[in-house]
Amino acid sequence: MARIAGVNIPNNAHIVIGLQAIYGIGATRAKLICEAANIAPDTKAKDLDETQLDALRDQVAKYEVEGDLRREVTMSIKRLMDMGCYRGFRHRRGLPCRGQRTRTNARTRKGPRKAIAGKK
């Protein structure tokens, strides 16, 4: 298995699909990386030689991926919460922060329903 940015790329996957296993690299960015490294997108990961892997590693290193990106996202959410703005307040309360309705729905963000003592 090829190892790029601390992630094992599956051997039997095309390199474009394998690059998407790295957090922060989607379909478009994976294609751009392959073009910049002069590698055909439909090449299997097991068919790459060491020079091609080094070229891919150099291209991926130009982007913020994996741990650094996760840390940046976490820090920006923490900054919003410390600032006390509306979005930070919604993050702190575990509610949607992009204007969705919450009277019904929003179960993913709010979690499972809490039981309320009913009348008997």
Swiss-Prot record:
It comes from Neisseria meningitidis serogroup B (strain ATCC BAA-335 / MC58). The keyword rRNA-binding applies. This is Small ribosomal subunit protein uS13. Transmembrane segments: none annotated. Residues 96-120 are annotated as: Disordered. Keywords: Ribonucleoprotein, Ribosomal protein, RNA-binding, rRNA-binding, tRNA-binding. Located at the top of the head of the 30S subunit, it contacts several helices of the 16S rRNA. In the 70S ribosome it contacts the 23S rRNA (bridge B1a) and protein L5 of the 50S subunit (bridge B1b), connecting the 2 subunits; these bridges are implicated in subunit movement. Contacts the tRNAs in the A and P-sites. GO terms for biological process: translation. Belongs to the universal ribosomal protein uS13 family.
